[in-house]
A protein has these predicted regions:
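RNA-contacting regions in translation and RNA-metabolism proteins
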Residues: 1-47, 59-82
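Glycine-centered tight-turn and secondary-structure capping sites
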Residues: 51-55
Length: 82
């Protein structure tokens, strides 16, 4: 499955940030032949922690996701869904 590495990495990082790790789910959607989107869902109280002040944590997660996607030769996007 395309994006498996991205999914594992994003899920791991997100679970380390939130208080309710059981509420975290990451779904990979294939947008094209070389593009994937990681849809991140977490409990509402934890979304603030996942996004961070001025989106700094979210930006870091996106950077890490792209680094993981590079291993598979993909482009990655991360969407935070509440």
């Amino acid at each position: 499955m395309k994006g498996a590495i991205v999914q594992r990495v994003v899920e791991y990082v997100t679970k380390e940030i939130v208080e309710d790790a059981d509420s975290v789910s990451v779904t990979i959607v294939e947008d094209g032949p070389d593009e994937v989107t990681a849809e991140v869902r977490a409990a509402k109280p934890d979304m603030g922690r996942v996004i961070g002040r001025r989106g700094r944590v979210a930006k870091s997660i996106r950077t890490i996701a792209q680094a993981a996607a590079d291993e598979e030769g993909l482009q990655a996007r991360v969407e935070f869904i509440d």
